[in-house]
């Protein structure tokens, strides 16, 4: 992707602001539109749904060539991955800003991380580095930990919370892959609201970051 930028654009459904992720050799948004997006993760390309891609694509969707495609109806839970002649392995590493994270063709059309969030990872890391004091971050609904790793790499003490034991396990693996075992990240599998109520009773204060899942 090109350097991080923000620009406004008008579509038939209104005006939007587009954020472009910064220099990321292992990820590339190749095309998007008509409710789908074509992306590259490392050496593999994927065609998967994206309800926010409301505009016409640069090339017709039926001409896209991908190593994997998530097919099915509008219901993500009923869809499935379909692979061509160059199927990806069960998981493979991608790097960003000195971090290494595993990606995979997961359920619900996901890839194990959200590359569009990298603008937020970079923003959070810059805030932590410029804080001039010790920083604690509570990352709710943290998934596989990209934000937590970026914050820990920048020097914060991180509490990572997710309700999925599998996601917590992937996050721990990503911490090891990124050589951040010397950084403080508490990996907690719990309900977010219950955890917050306990933290409030204990009088603990964090910088709060959350990405609430679709309900």
Q: For the regions a protein language model found, what residue spans apply to each?
A:
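Non-cysteine beta-strand/loop elements that form the S-adenosyl-L-methionine
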Residues: 209-214
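Non-catalytic substrate-recognition/targeting regions of SAM-dependent transferases
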Residues: 23-42, 46-115, 122
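Conserved class I S-adenosyl-L-methionine
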Residues: 132-143
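Conserved SAM-binding motif I beta-strand of class I
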Residues: 157-163
